[in-house]
Amino acid sequence: IIRNDIVNDIAILKSSKIGNEYIKIADDGAMKGEDIFVLGYPHGKHLSSESKVTKGVVSALQGLGNNYSQMQIDAAIQPGNSGGPVINDKGELIGVTVATADYEVMFDMFKSLPQNMNFAIKSQMLTNILDGSKISYETSKPSWFSFGSNDVKETVAEVDKATVYLECWSTEIAMKEAKESAAKLVDTVNSE
């Protein structure tokens, strides 16, 4: 871990496996109503080892409680999407997925379940962290006009090459899971 920003829930990691793939960061950030795509590994690799993509829009330029470091998106995200890229239709990074609305809390407060209420850290927060860590990155210049020349499928395929699966382990959790698995195995053997 090179840098950990607990407030924004972002960590900068260094890998011994360096690839040539990267995602340019949008210099002009996100715009409300902008089409977006989210890539990630919802529920880890339990569904499949292939990354998944969902589509949506930027719903608001602030997160919960007017949090200016976040934006609200309506693209579907699940556990396992956290840390994944949020890109615009040009393949530029405009955010990093971070959270979804807590159904139980929202139901207790409003007596209704939230739909498509998800959040991402804005790319500006990421560039602040990268700058503070003296890590170089590439931005794209603001583009005021989009002529639709980009093929979205090709754009997503390029970003997919730079999206990696990351599995985090806690020795305490791993030991607990190992004990539970062993207990299930003993129960199975004893019942036969």
Language-model region placement:
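A structural connector/turn signal
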Residues: 24-25, 72, 151-154
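Extracytoplasmic
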Residues: 6-10, 18-20, 31, 53-58, ...
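C-terminal cap/linker of serine protease catalytic domains
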Residues: 20, 42-46, 93-191
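Conserved active-site neighborhood of the chymotrypsin/trypsin-like protease fold
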Residues: 1-48, 66-70, 132, 136-146, ...
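Short amphipathic beta-strand and strand-loop transition segments with alternating hydrophobic
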Residues: 1-2, 62, 154
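Catalytic nucleophile loop of clan PA
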Residues: 76-97
